[in-house]
Design a protein with these regions (language model features):
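C-terminal active-site rim and adjoining tail of enzyme catalytic domains
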Residues: 47-51, 121-233
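Metal-dependent phosphodiesterase/phospholipase catalytic core, i.e.
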Residues: 8, 13-117, 139, 161, ...
Length: 233
């Protein structure tokens, strides 16, 4: 979710329209009326929806309400106080309490100060540490961790401190199964073409070595290729 130049909150992962709409301009420097001039042209089946536009956050929440879905909203950029107030107001329109995620602890802390009491996740791309745990306890946050930077010990430590763990960028079902058994509370599955990326537990390229050895409870010098997948159950 990002703020446009005229204070509209829109749903876009990227900061520009280049990848999805073919226009190399920053969302933060465009009004929403300008953004609507560029329909989405990339993505699966995009050609079947020629008038598909970058949606507003209000439209996204309305869609979630229609299908009784819990909104999960990553906050990319809120630049102004007015936009933050608008964001808080839009959250109240959701029939199910939204889950908010963000890389910036300052933004999450501000939302707590403004009265948001729902679930929030601090997105991290580094290993968990004591300072991170304390920050999460201060603002009642969970942690959203990149798969290669989380271990079973980290998950156990977080749980002991009342913190849930979300793991993202899992690339196949084997990785999902590993982190599920390690105790992850939420898992984001990046489902690719399984015929091309199908791998088992002994794949060198998919599962981080430390995570794999910890899960399998074997010495860290052991080769992944030396143990059959069935022996990891």
């Amino acid at each position: 979710m990002r703020e446009t130049a005229d204070g509209v909150l829109v749903v876009s992962h990227d900061d520009s329209l280049l990848r999805m709409c073919g226009e190399d301009r920053l969302i933060s420097e465009m009004t929403y009326e300008e953004i609507k001039q560029y329909p989405i042209i990339n993505g699966r089946n995009a050609s079947q929806y020629p008038d598909n536009l970058i949606p507003t956050l209000e439209q996204y929440i309305a869609c979630c309400n229609k299908y009784s879905v819990t909104p999960v909203i990553e906050i990319k950029s809120i630049r102004t106080e007015e936009a933050m107030n608008l964001f808080m107001q839009l959250l109240t329109e959701s029939q199910k309490e939204p889950v908010l995620i963000c890389f910036r602890i300052e933004t999450l802390g501000k939302l707590r100060e403004m009265g948001f009491t729902g679930k929030m996740q601090w997105i991290r791309t580094v290993r968990m540490n004591a300072s991170m745990i304390q920050q999460c306890k201060k603002y009642d946050l969970d942690i959203s961790a990149e798969y290669k930077n989380i271990s079973m010990n980290d998950i156990n430590n977080a749980h002991q401190n009342g913190i849930r763990i979300s793991v993202w960028l899992c690339r196949n079902e084997d990785m999902v199964d590993i982190f599920r058994k390690m105790g992850a509370d939420y898992i984001t599955y990046e489902k690719w073409n399984t015929d091309e990326v199908k791998m088992r537990y002994y794949s060198h390229s998919t599962i981080p070595r430390g995570v794999w050895h910890e899960y399998a409870k074997i010495p860290r010098h052991t080769s992944q290729n030396s143990i059959a997948a069935g022996n990891l159950e």
